[in-house]
Amino acid sequence: MSKRLQVVLNQDVRKLGNNGDLVEVAPGYARNYLLPQGIASLATPGILRQVEQRREKERQRLLAELQDAEARKVALKTVGKLIIRKQVGEENQIFGTVTTQDVADAIKERAGQDVDRRGITLPEIGKTGSYEAQVKLHPEVTATVQFDVIPL
């Protein structure tokens, strides 16, 4: 049974871990590569406390992001229906398409919130009418926004 050393990584290392991770490695790997290159530091009680503080700050930051996304979801629910104006032809067929950027602009105009257009999922929109879009605010939070497409 070989002895393993605990080290804290100072930068990302492929197949080993990310910056700030506490990992166990072979003594030779630590002594000959990780420590001399400055890639890792030996895990002392003081460094372990720093790692735990960093992890706690990261947990707090992620929790704050989630709470912010939940608050934005509630704000989007209270906005009501958005209105998107498009040029139409015969039988209420719209020219072009309603894009995610159109929906993001309507949300910004109505709710005052910046929303990343890449997080918006739209149905196929070919005619005027009422539609729903899914807006991903956070990996765990998705809001539904209703909007009407009307003629110019």
UniProtKB/Swiss-Prot annotation:
Gene3D superfamilies: Ribosomal protein L9, C-terminal domain, Ribosomal protein L9, N-terminal domain. One of its GO terms (biological process) is translation. It comes from the Bacteria. Keywords: Ribonucleoprotein, Ribosomal protein, RNA-binding, rRNA-binding. InterPro entries: Ribosomal_bL9, Ribosomal_bL9/RNase_H1_N, Ribosomal_bL9_bac/chp, Ribosomal_bL9_C, Ribosomal_bL9_C_sf, Ribosomal_bL9_N, Ribosomal_bL9_N_sf. Disulfide bonds: none annotated. One of its GO terms (molecular function) is rRNA binding. GO terms for cellular component: ribonucleoprotein complex; ribosome. Belongs to the bacterial ribosomal protein bL9 family. HAMAP family: Ribosomal_bL9. Binds to the 23S rRNA. This is Large ribosomal subunit protein bL9. It comes from Picosynechococcus sp. (strain ATCC 27264 / PCC 7002 / PR-6).
